[in-house]
C-alpha cells in the first residue's frame, strides 16, 4: 500500500517570486470533462486505466465525496485551444484523511506532461493559498505520495512542513 506524507503551511504566501503571470480562473462544474482528460493524460494506466475511471474520480471530487469542494481555491489553466493545461483541486475540509482539523486541503495538483517545469504548479498553489487567506483560513494541508519526489520537493521549496498527528497543536505561523 502506498504511503503518504502530510504537509502543512500557513496561507500567507511570502515566497511568491513574481506577480501572477498566468490567466488562472476558479474551476467550475463545466470543467469536469477537461479535468478528467487532463487527469487521464497525467497519470499512468495503473492509476486510471480508462478515461471513464478518471471521469468518475473527478465526479467524486466535485460532488463532495472526499469533502466539500472548494471551487474558489481550485484554479485551472486553459490554453488557447480550450484544453486544460493544469488544475489544482482543493477541498474546504477533507473527510478521508488524518490531517489537521478544519484545514483546507490541496487534493489534486495536475499539470499536463508537456507543460511541466514551467512554474505552473507553483502559481496554482500560490493562487489557492491567496484565496484561502482572503477567506480567513490560516493554514492548508496536502498529502504527497512518499514516492513522488518532484511534488515533495516543490512543496518543501515553497515552505510547506511535514505534519503528523502528534503535531496537532502546531500549525505554521
State each model region's role.
Residues 132-143:
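Conserved GNAT acetyl-CoA-binding A-motif
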Residues 43-62:
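Conserved GNAT-fold acetyl-CoA-binding loop/helix
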Residues 113, 141-152, 168-173:
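Conserved beta-strand-loop-alpha-helix junction that forms the acyl-donor binding cleft
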Residues 1-22, 169:
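Acyl-donor-binding surface of acyltransferase catalytic domains
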Residues 23-37, 48:
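A short beta-loop-alpha structural element at the N-terminal edge
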Residues 63-76, 86, 105:
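A short helix-loop-beta-strand connector motif used in the catalytic cores of GNAT acetyltransferases and
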Residues 91, 99-113:
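Conserved acetyl-CoA binding element of GNAT-fold acetyltransferases
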Residues 108-111, 117-130, 134, 152-157:
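Conserved acetyl-CoA-binding loop-helix of GNAT-fold acetyltransferases
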